[in-house]
Amino acid sequence: MSISELSQDLLEEILCRVPAISLKKLRSTCKLWNSLFIDKRVRNELRRVTVSQVFHCDGLLLYINGVDTIMVVWNPFMGQTRWVQPIARDQTHKYVLGSYQDIKSRITSYKILRYRYTLCGSKLAFEICELYSSSWRVLDITMDFDLYHNSCVSLKGKTYWLTFDKKDRELDMFSFDYATESFGNRMPLPYQFPRCSYETVALSVVREEKLSVLLQLRGTSRKEIWVTNKINETTQVLSWSKVLTLDNSDFGYCPGLSFFVDEEKKQVLCFEKCRVFHIHTNDEVFENKVYTVGEDNKVTQLRFEQSFCPKMDPYVFGYVPSLVQIEQPRRKRKRGD
């Protein structure tokens, strides 16, 4: 079947699933496709394809749409995509992407980890999917800690979460190893306080080598940014160094804070979603804010387009173009092959 034989409904469905960066190239495919881009109805349909979750690992991006019906792993640099079939439509799930290297073949493979609280709300349920197979498996994991969902990052293939102990509620950090499909040992933060003692806490990656954490206790505007030693596959113990202390009440109180830190320039770039009240309309809305703060505590706000996904917290990460080839489904061997 040729493109000209496809129905308009099917064409519109295809275009709604194409990454935005590729849409411009498709306009020159034929007159019909170009006319679809001009059609306001189709353009509005494209805008309705919202992204609810994004996660970054090794130059690959994992996208989940607003109703958990579309899951895509994308390498923007290589222009490759891999569509993965979600196992259920449930917006309470969280998804992360990680990698591991096979000891014998030295080949790097990728897995998607999905988790959510069970109906009783006291236990996390985990499922994992090999990217090459799209086959989901249930993991038997028992933990004595809870995940701080708003703060998880990927480094060297592992996923790191801020966590809090179920008994004393102290904030710590744990990582998930995709080779063993298990959580590692507890990694203490620079200082220990119960989760409720923190006004703001956020996790970040520094130059794909280190982890960084922003900490602010309740009742104070003082914020500290700490950075770990370099992390590799053999790192067993983390040591923390404080690189920046800020004392400014103009930022850091909003949920979903995401940040970068420049160790040399002693400067931090922050993204956060803030609740704003418009006097003229009496409407309360969420707006994304982007700003830099340095040792002088001066806040410089930057221009930033508002997101089409009001429910999604700002998520910022350092992206380095990757030559990683996305694994595609392996063909089942036929008899006689």
From Swiss-Prot:
One Pfam family in the UniProt entry: F-box
F-box domain span: 1-46
Highest taxon above the source species: Eukaryota
Record PANTHER family: BNACNNG10540D PROTEIN, F-BOX PROTEIN CPR30-LIKE
Name of the molecule in the record: Putative F-box protein At4g09870
